[in-house]
Amino acid sequence: MSENQVIKPGGRLVGEVQVPGDKSISHRAIMLGALGEGETVVRGLLRGEDNLATLEAFRSMGVAFCEDGDGALRIAGRGLHGLQEPQDVIDCGNSGTTMRLMTGLLAGQQFFSVMTGDRFLRKRPMKRVVGPLTAMGAHILGRAGGEYAPLALQGKTLQGITHHSAVASAQVKSALLLGGLYAEGPTTVHEPHRSRDHSERMLTWFGADVRPFEGGVTLHPGSCLKGGEVIVPGDISSAAFFMVAALIVPGSELLIRQVGVNPTRSGVIDILRQMGGNIELLNERDCSGEPVADILVKASDLKGVEIGGAVIPRAIDEFPVISVAAAFAEGRTVIRDARELRVKETDRIASMCSQMGALGALVEPREDGMVITGGPSLGAAKVSSLGDHRIGMSMAVAALRASAPVTVTDTECTATSFPGFWELFNSVREH
């Protein structure tokens, strides 16, 4: 049954908040923990639906998991060659990360496997990973010539390649690096811009021979992965909703604790600062190879800016809520070079234009982005998540500056990346 949330405008955000663990890092911790020798203990793991899909995929291949009393996840690693052939189709749910990264990993196994997903995932492009993996010798079948799931894989030994990626995609890069663990010879990926590097960092943490260079990365196979402890920081994509909310609601001052601030992911901080946002990083430190900080955000008068180029892949998941910030900034904000937004859980350019437009925002779609003309406030209306977790949470933030309560429909999807979002969102607001 569809869930709805009614958001009343106003209510400054004050105090402290800690967001759930990083979704991208959680996926990779499960995957590499399963492939590692010995036990891996993961602390701070996100229990969102996407990550649970990854966990269940490995459970179906014989990996044992158990929960500690303190909330940590213990993974009994089976080593690089210890996975078992799954007896049923692997259901990736709504998770593009699960499907794309698993495609690389499964391509190098010595068994047969099939992956599918929900109606949204089955519309998302997979050829971008299927194509280069096929060049490595993988045998993968899918709808429309491998463009769409379900995907069927007959695993085999792969050959390392040098791949020049047309887009800066961490999922493509990660799929090839995971396939490269099972390849003869090195695997090299070149990118037009640097994408998030969580896979490289965690592969290195587990003992793989990964060599980043300007414009790309090379993995040399042959190293076994060693289990250990992984501490997952808070997800900057989840923190972004609270950052924008605190910036746009007058009188707000919010401290967001223990957030991952990896430079390949912190584009949202750079963009919001460029817009005039008062954002400060405190207590900077390192956890399991990832930079972490506490983020102090104070309400600010924002201004419109131009956003494009190398910052786009560093903030690709945050553009729905960045567009909310732009709706309250003085002047025009132009987002370009972001065509990748059209192939997310929904077409996020069309989704944000339609839902923000319903509230009266001046948002104009472009093929590779949008133009937003800011104003002091929005109207009130019933809006929808459209089944996309980031759209739903972005509309909740927009509602804080509406003229009357806003109803957001179909909000159950927020559990994909942020279970407990609505409770946390309400807890930091003064009523």
Swiss-Prot record:
Positions that bind 3-phosphoshikimate: K23, S24, R28, S169, Q171, D317, K344
Coiled coil spans: none
Keyword NAD: no
Name of the featured protein: 3-phosphoshikimate 1-carboxyvinyltransferase
Domain of life: Bacteria
Active site: D317
Described function: Catalyzes the transfer of the enolpyruvyl moiety of phosphoenolpyruvate (PEP) to the 5-hydroxyl of shikimate-3-phosphate (S3P) to produce enolpyruvyl shikimate-3-phosphate and inorganic phosphate.
GO cellular component, one term: cytoplasm
Keywords: Amino-acid biosynthesis, Aromatic amino acid biosynthesis, Cytoplasm, Transferase
Pathway(s) the chain acts in: Metabolic intermediate biosynthesis; chorismate biosynthesis; chorismate from D-erythrose 4-phosphate and phosphoenolpyruvate: step 6/7
Family per similarity comment: Belongs to the EPSP synthase family.
Subunit architecture: Monomer.
GO biological process entries: amino acid biosynthetic process; aromatic amino acid family biosynthetic process; chorismate biosynthetic process
Name of the top EC class for this enzyme: transferase
Catalytic activity: 3-phosphoshikimate + phosphoenolpyruvate = 5-O-(1-carboxyvinyl)-3-phosphoshikimate + phosphate
Organism: Syntrophotalea carbinolica (strain DSM 2380 / NBRC 103641 / GraBd1)
Organismal lineage: Bacteria, Pseudomonadati, Thermodesulfobacteriota, Desulfuromonadia, Desulfuromonadales
